[in-house]
Amino acid sequence: MISKKLSWLVVGLVVLSLLVTGCQQLQPTPEAAEAPAAAGERLCDGVKIVFFPGGPPGGPFGTVVYNGAVAASADLGADMEVYWSDWNPEKMVSQFKEAVATNPDGIAIMGHPGDDAYETAVDEAEANGIIVTSQNTTLPRLEERYKGDGFGYVGQELYESGYMLGKEAVKRFGLQSGDRAMVWGLLSQPTRGLRTKGAIDALEEAGLTVDYIEIDSATDADATAGTPVFTGYVTSNPDVKLVVTDHGGLTATLETYLKAADKGPDDIYGIGFDLSPATLEAIRGGWTDLVLDQQPWLQGYLPIVQICLVKKYQFSGLHIDTGSGFAHADNVELLAPLVEQQIR
């Protein structure tokens, strides 16, 4: 019931946003505008959409994104097919090409591979009349090129989110110049890495010594695979005061990492991104101290809405920032019921 109410609230907010901002970019007027859906008919009935939740099936972040897409498809009547990608950029591009070959009405992609990797395939899709939009990680060049054809974005502003988390950690925990921090992130990915860079910049501006570790492909797909990396780092750097996990799956695994390194909940500050049932329990237990919530359920729901609105009414692409605020021990119980339902 909560999911249903949230779903219609989100649709209402999106439509209101369109009414307010629609004059900013006019679309060619269709020869005959479609009438609103008749009673019992849903907005997206018969519209075929391919959706990318990003990670492996059952992963803590991708599951919430998927839940949002499923809710939108049920509410609007879309016929949705899902491609799971294990957070592998090369796999995302390959699967996108496969999806284009099936000629759906629209495809909602994760932007991790970047503009260069996607460009040729997106150009082909757009030339064939397939609506393409993005979530979680921006594709600035492609979004600019095809915004008038419905290419939008739903997600956080990446650099700003990372910077905000790092800055808040310094302030909240009283970290000082010379303190050691470990950032475990994805700098190698062209746009996705901006969030990692934002966190590093904020910490270095405060004078912290930052050790960076790239998340390898095995850990990207299965966060528990990174346990030896974490324990090895902590053993070699016993003075580390802060660990930043720039990945929802790794953030959900912080308690496991710390216990494997024989650390208690008060020994190292642990911060990261995104809520999940495991992260909720880690916050309650003191293992995870600060999380930036980017509301991933919306990153599933709103791209489906985007494609439906473009298909039915030729609206242009919307750019929606889902980055919300911080979750920690003092406020997480307000969100706990929704986290447990994998909505927040």
Question: What residue spans do the PLM features occupy?
Answer:
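Short, low-complexity disordered leader/linker segments with a strong preference
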Residues: 1-48, 74, 123-130, 343-344
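Short, solvent-exposed amphipathic alpha-helices that sit
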Residues: 60-75, 161-165, 190-210, 225, ...
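Extracytoplasmic "Venus flytrap"
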Residues: 39-72, 76, 81-98, 111-116, ...
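Flexible loop/hinge segments that line or gate small-molecule binding clefts
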Residues: 115-116, 121-160, 276-284, 289, ...
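Short beta-strand elements in bilobed, periplasmic/extracellular small-molecule ligand-binding domains
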Residues: 73-86, 180-182, 203-223
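Hydrophobic alpha-helical
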Residues: 107-127, 199, 217-281
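Hydrophobic alpha-helical segments within soluble ligand-binding/sensing domains
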Residues: 43-44, 92, 152-179, 226-227, ...
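Hinge/cleft segment of the Venus flytrap/periplasmic-binding protein
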Residues: 30-47, 183-184, 202-206, 295-344
